[in-house]
């Protein structure tokens, strides 16, 4: 391992170690909301723009994941149809409401809104939309980054029922390189995926204890066909991406 790869691993490990203790109460509150939605046969929607949309994909149809999760996916807020355009789109007021209208978010559901900066129009609008519909809101964001750049703008963290602070620094990248004024090594994805998978694992454990945990099995494992097929049939009506 080179010096810089070692530094990156050490930084991520240190941040995760700190999050395990500092976020424990908030992660438990997030799991409470999601478990309540599952018990009421509601859905957990996950929204993010740019690289944050990867959190929605991570939790969707995932081996070891819960079938109650629904990703909110649209090319205009993702990267594959034009990264520069998506960065512009997420700053337009009113742009994501037509996207959200496709999903039928309702009272008793949960919307997880992922935004590292937590100030762009799209995540703010998504949180407000969820509030209008009676859904609970979990925000995954960097509190430090958001506070640094807010400058009087509404922050996602002010709209959420539960805030999961990913501990990413302003600008996301953590490693200084000699000879460059720019940093490398973004950490928000590694931290965010770990936080959310931990929360959903907690939810799954609770549901298993209650006798009904809709957990997907890896497609290459014996018995996965029947298990996953039954879950797809059960949840297809509320998840257009199955």
UniProtKB/Swiss-Prot annotation:
Protein name per the record: UPF0309 protein BAB2_0325
Record GO biological process: carbohydrate derivative metabolic process
Domain of life of the organism encoding this protein: Bacteria
Domain SIS: 30-214
SUPFAM superfamilies assigned: SIS domain
Family: Belongs to the UPF0309 family.
Matching Pfam families: SIS_2
Gene Ontology molecular-function annotations: carbohydrate derivative binding
